[in-house]
Curated annotation (Swiss-Prot):
Stated name of the protein: UPF0213 protein lin0209
Organism, scientific name: Listeria innocua serovar 6a (strain ATCC BAA-680 / CLIP 11262)
Coiled coil: none
GIY-YIG domain: residues covered: 5-80
Pfam families: GIY-YIG (PF01541)
PANTHER family, sorted: UPF0213 PROTEIN YHBQ
Lineage: Bacteria, Bacillati, Bacillota, Bacilli, Bacillales
Annotated family: Belongs to the UPF0213 family.
Amino acid sequence: MAKANEHFFYVLKCSDNSYYGGYTTDVMRREAEHNAGIRCKYTKTRRPVKVIHFEKFETRSEATKAEAAFKKLSRKNKDSYLSEREEESK
């Protein structure tokens, strides 16, 4: 169960190898919703999807700003962003 004060930016990898970035308070629940075709037109036709990255933020505003910034990136820059964060987590 998610805590009310947890805010996450997450990235899904879709079955067509595209990325989807979003905001949620519960990453596991939101992944299940995407895979069930609930509340997202983009991923509905690109299932199954898998969470490949998420970041926790103190506020909703910070998390949605991270989401917006990610969505503005080119595919090449999205790949770089995800690779850099993967290296940081090792």
